[in-house]
Design a protein with these regions (language model features):
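N-terminal loops that bind phosphate or other acidic moieties
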Residues: 1-266
Length: 266
C-alpha cells in the first residue's frame, strides 16, 4: 500500500472516550489524580480503542521493534538470539523483541518498508501495542524514515507506539509532519540522556513516565515502561469507584473528587 493511502486512514482518537476513562479514574476511591501518568496513558489508550468501560479495556499483546542500519547487523543478530538486555527486560511483560535491518535505498522506499513491516507484524502477531528502539548511526535518515512509515501504519491500524530515544522521536516528528493525528497514537517510554531527547518530547507534546538515565534509545526504557502501561490498565479495571464499592452517598460527598467538582461548578 502506498504511503499516501495509509495517511488517508489516520484519524484522531476518540476524545470523548478519553474523557470518560479519565472520569472513571477521578471517581475511584483514591486521591484525585494520584496515579498521575498511569491515568493519562490508560485514558489515551481508551481513546485509541474507542472504549471506556473497564471490561472493555484489556492488556494489549505487544512487541518491541529495534530498528538497525547495515552497520549494526551484529547487534541485530544478538537481539534475535536473545543476547541483548532489552530482550530480558521485555520478557517481564511478555513482549517479543524483533530486530529489523533497514535495507531501503531512498526515503520513499524506507517509509514503505517500515509501513509494510508494521502491517505484517500487527496482522501476524495480533499486536495492540508496539515499542520502538533504535540501534543505528546517529540520525540515520533511512532508518528514521522506516520508523516513520511504521508509525504511520500503526496509527492507521489504531495501534499505539511507544517511543524510546532521540531517533524514534525524530521518526515520530516526521510521521506527525505527514499526518498530524499520528501524535494521538504516540507514547513516550522514558527520557534518555541523549542530547535533545527532552526537547524533542516537549516539541511533540509528550511526557515520559520514566527518567532512568539510560544513555541511548535502544529500547530498554520502553521495555520497562511497558510495566507501567499494564499498571495503569490494572488500576482502571480492578480499583473500585465509590458507587461500585457501595459507599454511602453522604461519605461520597466528602471525597476529593466531589469537592473538586463543586469548586469547578462555582
Amino acid at each position: 500500500m502506498h504511503i499516501d493511502e495509509i495517511i488517508e486512514k489516520i484519524v484522531p482518537t476518540d476524545k470523548d472516550c478519553q474523557q470518560k476513562a479519565q472520569d472513571r479514574f477521578d471517581a475511584l476511591i483514591k486521591p484525585l489524580g494520584s496515579l498521575a501518568q498511569l491515568e493519562t496513558m490508560t485514558s489515551r489508550y481508551a481513546a485509541i480503542l474507542g472504549k471506556y468501560k473497564k471490561e472493555d479495556i484489556d492488556y494489549p499483546k505487544r512487541s518491541l521493534f529495534v530498528w538497525c542500519d547495515a552497520a549494526h547487523g551484529e547487534q541485530a543478530a544478538k537481539i534475535m538470539r536473545g543476547q541483548w538486555p532489552v530482550v530480558l527486560l521485555a520478557a517481564e511483560t511478555n513482549a517479543k523483541v524483533e530486530a529489523f535491518l533497514v535495507t531501503a535505498m531512498d526515503e520513499e522506499e524506507a517509509l514503505e518498508e517500515g509501513a509494510g513491516l508494521m502491517q505484517e507484524h500487527i496482522h501476524k502477531d495480533g499486536l495492540g501495542l508496539v515499542g520502538f528502539g533504535c540501534v543505528a548511526a546517529a540520525e540515520d535518515e533511512l532508518v528514521i524514515s522506516a520508523m516513520a512509515g511504521a508509525i504511520l501504519q500503526a496509527a492507521a491500524m489504531k495501534v499505539p507506539v511507544m517511543l524510546d530515544g532521540v531517533a524514534t522521536c525524530l521518526a515520530a516528528k516526521k510521521a506527525v509532519a505527514l499526518a498530524p493525528a499520528v501524535i494521538d497514537y504516540c507514547f513516550a517510554g522514558h527520557v534518555s540522556l541523549e542530547e535533545g531527547a527532552e526537547e524533542l518530547l516537549q516539541e511533540l507534546g509528550l511526557t515520559a513516565p520514566l527518567r532512568l538515565n539510560i544513555p541511548d534509545g535502544a529500547g530498554e526504557g520502553v521495555a520497562v515502561a511497558f510495566t507501567l502501561f499494564n499498571a495503569g490498565i490494572k488500576s482502571f479495571k480492578e480499583m473500585e469507584t465509590f458507587e461500585e464499592a457501595g459507599v454511602h452517598v453522604e461519605m461520597k460527598e466528602f471525597s476529593l473528587h466531589e469537592q473538586v467538582k463543586k469548586e469547578k461548578a462555582k
